[in-house]
């Protein structure tokens, strides 16, 4: 199972330098888990940068994976991770979703570098 965080989705949709690193887990829709917080973050950023039509296309592609909403158990797991690891709320919800589902978290967010169960792809310098 795989979770791609918002930075990975945005890199993929922008066809950025690391897009190919995220293409595999994104293409494997049967094993793709999509936390609802990533829908929010990607829609908002795409709306700002490309407009509503493009943002809706991005979210439609994301919804081909299995969406996971936040319930009480996930919220509490995320809060504990946030406290223990000093992560922002969205990051802790994404990491908690991956861990609850036994999934690998794919990201280029350096907040996750070196964490267990995380495939961290550094952003190119420059």
Residue ranges: model-predicted function:
Residues 33, 68-69, 121:
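General small-molecule cofactor/ligand-binding pocket signal
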Residues 1-34, 46-58, 126:
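Short, well-structured N-terminal submotif of metal-dependent ribonuclease cores
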Residues 10, 40-43, 79:
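Amphipathic alpha-helical segments within well-ordered protein domains
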Residues 67-108:
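Active-site neighborhoods of divalent-metal-dependent phosphate/nucleic-acid chemistry enzymes
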Residues 8-9, 38, 74, 93-94, ...:
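Alpha-helix capping/helix-boundary segments
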Residues 29, 45, 49, 62-65, ...:
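Alpha-helix C-capping/helix-to-loop hinge sites
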Residues 1, 64-65, 95, 99-126:
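Acidic, PIN/NYN-like endoribonuclease modules and their adjacent C-terminal/linker elements
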């Amino acid at each position: 199972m795989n979770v791609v965080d918002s930075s990975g989705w945005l890199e993929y949709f922008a066809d950025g330098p690391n897009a190919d690193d995220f293409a595999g887990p994104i293409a494997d829709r049967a094993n793709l888990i999509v936390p609802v917080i990533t829908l929010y973050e990607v829609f908002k950023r795409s709306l700002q940068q490309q407009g509503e039509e493009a943002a809706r296309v991005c979210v439609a592609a994301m919804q081909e994976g299995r969406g996971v909403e936040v319930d009480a158990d996930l919220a509490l797991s995320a809060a504990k991770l946030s406290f223990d690891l000093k992560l922002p709320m969205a990051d802790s919800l994404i990491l908690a979703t991956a861990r609850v589902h036994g999934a690998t978290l794919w990201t280029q967010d350096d907040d996750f570098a070196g964490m267990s169960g995380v495939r961290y792809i550094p952003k190119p310098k420059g």
